[in-house]
Amino acid sequence: MTVRVGVIGTGMIGQDHIRRLTRVVTGAEIVAVTDIDADRAASVAGGVGARTMPSGADVIGSADVDAVLVTSWGPTHAEHVLAAIEAGKAVFCEKPLATEVEDCLRIVEAESARGKRLVQVGFMRRYDAGYREMKELVDAGGIGTPLMAHCVHRNPTVPETYHSAMAAQDTAVHEIDTLRWLLDDEIVSAQVIRPRRTSKRFEHLQDPQIMLFETESGARIDVEVFVNCQYGYDIQCEVVGESGTVRLPDPARTGLPSAGSVRAAITQDWKQRFADAFDAELQSWVDSVAHGAAGGPSAWDGYAATAICGATVEALHSGQVVPVALKDRPGLYGGNNQ
């Protein structure tokens, strides 16, 4: 079966996903595209032999669209995902599932009412080979009961439009989802520490930040977010257990011998660092649509991430430990291991 995909949003990530679906992933075809920038949509559609449509509603309602890819502006996600659920169509939604917790819950409730999973959220790190190796070891009991996790998320620079809350909402959201999945544990509180600010930042920005989380089991997670580190895109993760530790392996790098030493280039952005994970993520989605059973990060995971990010932003502003109070998980959604 070839999955016929309609795409809502042809910005940078939308174009990246369209390229993957047409050049890397097997079993998919782009048939319809829409964007608020009609000229851009037409240009992208022409490159893959798809047609343009006036709106997301038109894409979702099209009889020849089997599944929907939502890569539009974050505040529009809920509208499109809810429409896809109502139409009974599988939908891949880039993070965030929705920018507001209430909208995430509407999506969870709508999907639960249908009694079938249709939504997959774009948390690509679950498909990264290094993280998957860590997950296998943790699940197998290789380090004993997890006690702590240490994470680092560094970017070389960010644009002036990046503000302090985005350290949680756009950056650490990946660590938040990954650690929920990696530990199969729920985060119950958030705290943010403000270290000395780097001089390599815009005046309005608190950078770096250290985020502290506690899980239901009592495990502790610390996440360093430093988005103006200058030297490269650096992702680190270590889980400490009762009988051992497991660390995210560094990506393969080509060594450059020079002046008595060997230098290795450092990845400069997320697109390069997680290229293989993005490929695997979309292949998994297409395969699941073809087999009629959604997998991967769920609407519940999207809701939890948005709620935890909200608590983290509150903690940043208040300086307090902020509890995370999630609703009861509907029966449609299992644990964090999907």
Curated annotation (Swiss-Prot):
Annotated GO biological process: inositol catabolic process
Q: Name one GO molecular function term.
A: nucleotide binding
Q: What is its EC number?
A: 1.1.1.18
Q: SUPFAM superfamilies this protein is in?
A: Glyceraldehyde-3-phosphate dehydrogenase-like, C-terminal domain, NAD(P)-binding Rossmann-fold domains
Record's keyword terms, sorted: NAD, Oxidoreductase
Which branch of life, at top level?
Bacteria
Task: Please tell me whether the keyword Oxidoreductase is annotated for this protein.
Answer: yes
Record-linked InterPro entries: Gfo-Idh-MocA_inositol_DH, Gfo/Idh/MocA-like_OxRdtase_C, Gfo/Idh/MocA-like_OxRdtase_N, MI/DCI_dehydrogenase, NAD(P)-bd_dom_sf
Name the chemical reaction catalysed here.
myo-inositol + NAD(+) = scyllo-inosose + NADH + H(+)
Q: How does it assemble?
A: Homotetramer.
Question: Which family does the record assign?
Answer: Belongs to the Gfo/Idh/MocA family.
Quote the protein name from its UniProt record: Inositol 2-dehydrogenase 3
